[in-house]
């Protein structure tokens, strides 16, 4: 059975709780991603995730300065999975929480991120990823709330 650690992106950008929203936005731009995990000061323990949507709704749209702490814009305690999680478990979490990406951890330490795109690239998971995307998109008409 395929494990998420076999499909996740392990070489990823992340922010620490010491970063600000400007630094997060630059890292997202440079990596061409729409979300970036946030780790504790130790640089390893996952504590949050910030999306481009979070930066807009919790920062720019309410006229917060670029020096705003990343912790003020991030989603704390994000849904995450351990490296040995199954594809089915991840797809279920994505569909039930309307997520397109989920941080991957090992003993609470950030080791990667898995996206619907990662799952759609695998022949074994492509069809199931499409089904999860359909479930996510059906619930995507929310007016408020912050999701990653």
Curated annotation (Swiss-Prot):
SMART domains: CBS. The keyword Membrane does not apply. SUPFAM superfamilies: CBS-domain pair (SSF54631). Residues 127-148 are annotated as: Disordered. Residues 8-68, 74-130 form the CBS domain. Keywords: CBS domain, Repeat. Residues 139-148 have a biased composition (Basic and acidic residues). Pfam families: CBS. The keyword Signal does not apply. InterPro entries: CBS_dom, CBS_dom_sf, Diverse_CBS-Domain. This is Uncharacterized protein YlbB. The lineage of its organism: Bacteria, Bacillati, Bacillota, Bacilli, Bacillales.
């Amino acid at each position: 059975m395929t494990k998420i650690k076999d499909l996740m992106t392990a070489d990823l950008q992340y922010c620490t709780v010491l970063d600000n929203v400007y630094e997060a936005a630059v890292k997202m731009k440079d990596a061409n991603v729409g979300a970036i995990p946030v780790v504790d000061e130790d640089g390893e323990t996952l504590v949050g995730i910030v999306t481009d949507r979070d930066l807009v709704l919790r920062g720019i749209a309410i006229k917060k300065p670029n020096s705003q702490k990343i912790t003020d814009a991030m989603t704390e305690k994000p849904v995450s999975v351990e490296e040995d999680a199954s594809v089915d478990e991840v797809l279920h979490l994505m569909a039930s929480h309307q997520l397109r990406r989920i941080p991957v951890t090992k003993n609470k330490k950030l080791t990667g991120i898995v996206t619907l795109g990662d799952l759609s690239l695998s022949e074994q998971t492509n069809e199931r990823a499409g089904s999860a995307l359909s479930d996510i998109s059906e619930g995507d008409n929310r007016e408020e709330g912050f999701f990653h």
